[in-house]
């Protein structure tokens, strides 16, 4: 099961994030799926697709690389790094045109080849600093 679930995570990052394929969201999420850590919990494919559309609008060229991945039973933990250009206003901030790099970690729980629950944590503050929305305090 661990090997199959790791393949699903690879597919998720490749197709959903790097290629922007929303059909994969419908294939891998169910109405029972809950994604945590991206603001309010996202429940089901439609809620995730709304977040995904806003994010891809803000960073249409996002590329995510999997740096490390471990799996046990129905869980997969992944450490990833991303690069993109902030060229859209999908997240509510005017496009800055700035290149960004950030990293994060996630844990995905699978049942019957479906992503049922996901937990996400990434450097949101660093990302906001890079696009000029949040300034570092003067030292």
What is the predicted function of each stretch?
Residues 1-139:
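C-terminal and inter-domain tail/linker signature
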